């Protein structure tokens, strides 16, 4: 009897092992973002998580951590390398020298083909990212809404006359200095207090982030300059990505691209609404720079930034980046 029962018992054991293996196959991916839950981009990350689960038949579980809860603004590379998060936004980090000086770039971009442009740009920085253990995953394009906000009306953005202006990176700092201002670095969640206390006279920030943190009460005057290509890329730990099955790698990449496509029109509509709401609630105004002046400012910024890009990227990659942006220009 015992000998006859053994195959049955073995079958049960094998069945349990297979079931346990199936449970263990589910991969948790922790995604860290600086945006808060009232930001439309948070909905984009939720869509990404839904698509990743759907395309992987439930094997990928993307967990979203908003409002910089896992790490600070400048700590994305360290967080991903150290396992604090699996996917994080990547700031202007010196370990990614070319990305640092080109992920925000002075350019007159046609955003009709933004998704294709972002994908092509991600390919150009892929090798650099791999060298520090990262894989580009999600493009977070903020070209549409990266603008300037001030406590008082300003006549000429190119004449800041000593104003202290919040900067987000090396390019913006160089532009602020070229316009006679003084750049000040302030993390997104600290901008409101800095503006309220007079630490800064103006800020460079995306409309989405500006609105999410309700900054219209302290910085109600907007200058719509439209000077940049901007892409704060979300990158994944390369070892974590490589450990996924081929099908789940493909599922994750497809989910990222589809979420970008899903978010783009919603993001732009949301930004447009927030500009109107911000001006109305803050009692301020939104002014645009005339096109001839705008193009001259972009050209001057590009010329001053050429040496930085060449040094950081190397001549060949620098030329490829500039050629890419030019090919998607207006």
Predicted regions and their residues:
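Bacterial N-terminal signal peptides that target proteins for export
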Residues: 1-10
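Bacterial N-terminal signal peptides
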Residues: 9-17
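N-terminal secretory/targeting leader peptides
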Residues: 24-114, 127-330
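Catalytic cores of large soluble enzymes that bind and process phosphate-bearing ligands
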Residues: 117
């Amino acid at each position: 009897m015992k000998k006859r029962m053994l195959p049955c018992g073995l079958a049960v054991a094998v069945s349990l092992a297979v079931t346990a293996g199936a449970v263990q196959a589910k991969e948790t991916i922790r995604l860290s973002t600086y945006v808060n839950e009232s930001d439309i981009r948070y909905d984009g990350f939720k869509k990404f998580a839904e698509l990743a689960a759907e395309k992987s038949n439930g094997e990928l579980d993307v967990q979203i951590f908003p409002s910089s809860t896992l790490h600070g603004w400048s700590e994305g590379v360290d967080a991903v390398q150290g396992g604090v998060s699996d996917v994080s936004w990547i700031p202007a980090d010196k370990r990614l020298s070319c990305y640092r000086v080109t992920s925000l770039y002075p350019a007159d971009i046609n955003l009709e083909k933004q998704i294709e442009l972002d994908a092509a740009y991600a390919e150009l920085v892929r090798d650099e990212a791999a060298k520090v253990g990262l894989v580009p995953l999600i493009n977070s394009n903020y070209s549409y809404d990266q603008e300037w906000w001030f406590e008082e009306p300003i006549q000429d953005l190119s004449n800041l006359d000593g104003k202290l202006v919040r900067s987000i990176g090396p390019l913006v700092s160089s532009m602020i200095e070229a316009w006679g201002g003084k750049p000040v670095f302030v993390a997104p969640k600290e901008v409101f207090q800095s503006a309220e206390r007079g630490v800064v006279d103006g800020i460079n920030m995306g409309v989405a982030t500006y609105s999410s943190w309700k900054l219209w009460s302290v910085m109600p005057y907007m200058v719509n300059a439209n000077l940049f290509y901007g892409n704060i890329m979300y990158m994944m730990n390369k070892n974590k990505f490589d450990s996924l099955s081929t099908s789940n790698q493909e599922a994750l990449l497809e989910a990222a691209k589809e979420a970008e496509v899903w978010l783009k029109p919603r993001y732009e509509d949301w930004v447009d609404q927030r500009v109107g709401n911000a001006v109305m609630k803050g009692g301020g105004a939104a002014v645009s720079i005339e096109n001839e002046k705008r193009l001259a400012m972009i050209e001057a910024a590009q010329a001053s930034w050429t040496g930085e890009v060449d040094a950081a990227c190397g001549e060949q990659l620098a030329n490829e980046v500039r050629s890419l942006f030019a090919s998607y220009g207006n």
